UniProtKB/Swiss-Prot annotation:
Known function: Acts as a specific nuclear import carrier for HSP70 proteins following heat-shock stress: acts by mediating the nucleoporin-dependent translocation of ATP-bound HSP70 proteins into the nucleus. HSP70 proteins import is required to protect cells from heat shock damages.
Naturally occurring in which organism (per UniProt): Gallus gallus (Chicken)
InterPro entries xrefs: Hikeshi-like_C, Hikeshi-like_N, OPI10
Protein name, as recorded: Protein Hikeshi
Keyword vocabulary terms for this entry: Cytoplasm, Nucleus, Protein transport, Transport
Annotated compartments: Cytoplasm, Cytosol; Nucleus
Keyword hit for Lipid biosynthesis: no
GO terms for cellular component: cytosol; nuclear speck; nucleus
Keyword presence, Cytoplasm: yes
GO biological process, one term: protein import into nucleus
Gene name tied to this protein: HIKESHI
Signal sequence coordinates: none
Length: 197
């Protein structure tokens, strides 16, 4: 029913079923994992009105299981990518795996999937930073570079009355830089690869 994928590793397509409606994947050497993909295999859909909440579990310093809600998968949204690299020091959250005695090993984390009503899934709040940004890193870099350039150039802005004439320096009006900045942002939003044309 479910699969789990970590970059550079084989796909796991056989979770351990720990209850009728709960499944667990082991993630060995979890300290070196940044992202996890959880997906439905397409062989068995969720029953009508049901979906699966996805949890990340890791052992804390004392070896106790810490569970954190990452998000969910449904028949309409059969896969999701979760960032887990920043979650290994966070606090746990309420979870449906509490009564189960799942073995914990210091270097093995787990992804848990709990089949639940869709109306319950949408009311749950995933841990912050688990969702992967939908903006690619190039677009994010370009946006930050634009902001940095505009802020840097604007920090030198002076009024015409404050200017001291210097024949060896060229001055660019701040409104020209602002217009360029706004145009570049607009074009980047419309097509992040516009600069290649």
């Amino acid at each position: 029913m479910f699969g789990c994928l970590v970059a550079g590793r084989l796909v796991q397509a056989a979770p351990q079923q720990v209850a009728e409606d709960k499944f667990v994947f082991d993630l060995p050497d979890y300290e070196n994992i940044n992202h996890v993909v959880v997906f439905m295999l397409g062989t068995v859909p969720f029953p009508e009105g049901m979906g699966g909440s996805v949890y990340f579990c890791y052992p804390d310093q004392s070896g106790m299981a810490v569970w954190q809600l990452l998000g969910f998968v449904t028949n309409e949204k059969p896969s999701a990518i979760f960032k887990i690299s920043g979650l290994k020091s966070g606090k746990g959250s309420q979870h449906p795996f509490g009564a189960m005695n799942l073995p914990q090993t210091p270097t093995v984390a787990q992804i848990g999937i709990s089949v639940e009503l869709l109306e319950n899934l949408v009311q749950q709040t995933p841990v912050a930073n688990a969702a992967v940004s939908s903006v690619d890193s190039f677009t994010e870099f370009t946006q930050k570079m634009l902001d940095n350039f505009y802020n840097f150039a604007s920090s030198f802005a002076v009024t015409q009355a404050q200017m001291t004439p210097n024949p060896s320096e060229a001055f660019i009006p701040a409104n020209v830089v602002l217009k360029w900045y706004e145009n570049f942002q607009r074009r980047l939003t419309q097509n992040p690869l516009f600069w290649k044309t």
